[in-house]
């Protein structure tokens, strides 16, 4: 998983990171 940055809503980063941290998710 990425430690941040722009994520797609279908990206594993968004599912695992952005949904939890509410960080930069496009």
UniProtKB/Swiss-Prot annotation:
Keywords for this protein: Disulfide bond, Knottin, Secreted, Toxin
Domain of life, per lineage: Eukaryota
Keyword field contains Amino-acid biosynthesis: no
GO cellular component, one term: extracellular region
Secreted in keyword set: yes
Disulfide cysteine pairs (residue numbers): 7-18, 13-25
Single Gene Ontology MF annotation: toxin activity
Tissue note: Expressed by the venom duct.
Protein localization: Secreted
Signal peptide: none
Principal location class: secreted
Note: This peptide corresponds to allele E1i. Has not been merged with other alleles since they may differ due to geographic variation (see strain in PubMed:19606224).
Similarity-based family: Belongs to the conotoxin O1 superfamily.
Free-text comment on this protein's domains from its UniProt entry: The presence of a 'disulfide through disulfide knot' structurally defines this protein as a knottin.
Name of the featured protein: Conotoxin Eb6.18
């Amino acid at each position: 998983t990425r430690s941040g940055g722009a994520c797609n809503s279908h990206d594993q980063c968004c599912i695992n990171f952005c949904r939890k941290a509410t960080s930069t998710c496009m």
